Amino acid sequence: MGKKEQVEQLTTYMANFVSYIGKVLPDDIKAKINELAEKEDSPLSKVIYQTMQRNQVLAKELNRPSCQDTGVLQFWVKCGTNFPLIGELEALLKEAVVKATFEAPLRHNSVETFDEYNTGKNVGKGIPTVFWDIVPDSDKCEIYTYMAGGGCTLPGKAMVLMPGEGYEGVTKFVMDVMTSYGLNACPPLLVGVGVATSVETAALLSKKALMRPLGSHNENERAASMEKLLEDGINAIGLGPQGMGGKYSVMGVHIENTARHPSTIGVAVNVGCWSHRRGHIIFDKDLNYTITTHSGVTL
């Protein structure tokens, strides 16, 4: 297969993948929704979870997006330097989004700032957003695909703390965000927390945390312990499904961190709603693929 045919093939694969994740939730998210539905005991909570579950069934049966807000497309690309299409990836991902927009279909969610017009294709300046991790001497390419909806994006916040505020300050920041904005972000939520030096590094980490599978933990024992403490604390707020009250407010809390400057603690929060539409696909150099987030899928 020549390079032109490879580009066309990968574009089609990614367009189909984007379309699919807008309609079918990842396996771990579906399992968590079912788990929380069993654990909640209030009649209203159970009705809401039953509605969520029914929504997923209908989305797949009718081949329609599971939420009308199909978000802005964001891609985390972990690509080997020897992957044959590394130089074509950004352009073909943009083309894949356009293709998916009309085939899925996806709601038109790309508004050019300052000019204030909708492009009608879900692409624009900097959209879709592509974040890169380059892997030396590898010929594989991993792509995390995420639909960033408006409701779950609104609570996003970042700031830099004085070092004396410590991890108590990080906890207070996260809890302040959740008590102020979590209600309207379509809980139960997946909460991503980034801890680093500055606002931009912490913010990127907090979004990257949302790509992790449910049930995973930070490799640092102290950070993993903080994930559990924050999860328990946010659940105690009692947001419940759709903010209507209940025992469980979150599907999980994921912390990603780097080393930091001794004089600062950068912290950020990003959240994913109950309809957490993310996908993870791995390509080898011949474009054979493995999908880790959704079982039984053929593109």
Model-identified regions with their sequence ranges:
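Non-transmembrane, aqueous-exposed alpha-helical and coiled segments at domain scale
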Residues: 1-299
